[in-house]
């Protein structure tokens, strides 16, 4: 495993740990999700470029499309929750009441 793959794996792991440990605010959870998606994009792009898979070259672009949709939905949910409840704490949100 090369050094760049190990760095991207560490970035993914740190983002995942940040998502699991610091779940107090919705904005920090969204930032951790974006870090995970970015590290996945870089790892997939490097793997496809190193193995010369031309048929799979669209997969990182599709991942970026899903990441953009996830970011837009997450930010719209953040705006809706913060205007409705006046806070963005994840612990105080209940999916059955929202």
Curated annotation (Swiss-Prot):
InterPro entries on file: NADH_UbQ_OxRdtase_chain4L/K (IPR001133), NUOK/Mnh_C1-like (IPR039428)
Keyword Ligase among record annotations: no
GO annotations of cellular component type: mitochondrial inner membrane; respiratory chain complex I
Localization: Mitochondrion inner membrane
Enzymatic reactions: a ubiquinone + NADH + 5 H(+)(in) = a ubiquinol + NAD(+) + 4 H(+)(out)
Keyword NAD attributed: yes
Enzyme class: translocase
EC numbers, comma separated: 7.1.1.2
GO BP annotations listed: ATP synthesis coupled electron transport
Keywords annotated in UniProt: Electron transport, Membrane, Mitochondrion, Mitochondrion inner membrane, NAD, Respiratory chain, Translocase, Transmembrane, Transmembrane helix, Transport, Ubiquinone
Transmembrane annotation, as ranges: 1-21, 29-49, 61-81
Topology class, membrane: Multi-pass membrane protein
Molecular function as annotated in GO: NADH dehydrogenase (ubiquinone) activity
Subunit relationships: Core subunit of respiratory chain NADH dehydrogenase (Complex I) which is composed of 45 different subunits.
Family to which the UniProt record says this protein belongs: Belongs to the complex I subunit 4L family.
Function comment: Core subunit of the mitochondrial membrane respiratory chain NADH dehydrogenase (Complex I) which catalyzes electron transfer from NADH through the respiratory chain, using ubiquinone as an electron acceptor. Part of the enzyme membrane arm which is embedded in the lipid bilayer and involved in proton translocation.
Name of the protein in its database record: NADH-ubiquinone oxidoreductase chain 4L
Natural source organism: Vampyressa bidens
Protein's gene: MT-ND4L
């Amino acid at each position: 495993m090369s050094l760049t793959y190990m760095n991207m794996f560490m970035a993914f792991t740190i983002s995942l740990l940040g998502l699991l440990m610091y779940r107090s605010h919705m904005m920090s959870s969204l930032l951790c999700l974006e870090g995970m998606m970015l590290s996945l994009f870089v790892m997939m792009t490097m793997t496809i470029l190193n193995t010369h898979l031309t048929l799979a070259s669209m997969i990182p672009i599709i991942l970026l499309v899903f990441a953009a949709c996830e970011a837009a939905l997450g930010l719209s949910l953040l705006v809706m929750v913060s205007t409705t409840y006046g806070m963005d704490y994840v612990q105080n949100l209940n999916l059955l009441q929202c």
